[in-house]
Amino acid sequence: MLTTHPVALTVDAVDAAKTYLRHETDEEDASILALVTAALVHAEGYLGQLLLERNVVERLPVTTAWQRLGATPVRSVASVTGIPAEGANFLLSPDSYALDINRHHDGWIRIPHPGSAGQVDIAYRAGLVPGWPDLPEAISLAVLRIAAHLHAH
């Protein structure tokens, strides 16, 4: 199970969309923000990667085999929490698991020493760029075009 924190778009994204849509007032800012958010999520689904960095928590079964993390590109891993069948969750020590973030920023994990954990929650940060202003122009324009399509229909 993969849980991503909501996309935190800034005023930059709303302003870019308003310019693209030729809106000059602030009356529709909330709906424009919702459209840009939906467009961004749509683009991320199409591209198969998170565009804007955010926190992710992913639950995986314990195994000694390498497992690929679901969100990409992975920037960093914050923690690995063991989830036992009974009892309280616990942080796994770094020597209990192995992590690899390859050159494509795909995250991989294996758990050779899980203790009593049958599953683990991996908390990590993933995304192509930190914020809207950092997106490549072609990608931000594509997101704006999707938002404009949603706005028109």
Locations of regions flagged by a protein language model:
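Divalent metal-cofactor coordination and adjacent catalytic microenvironments
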Residues: 1-153
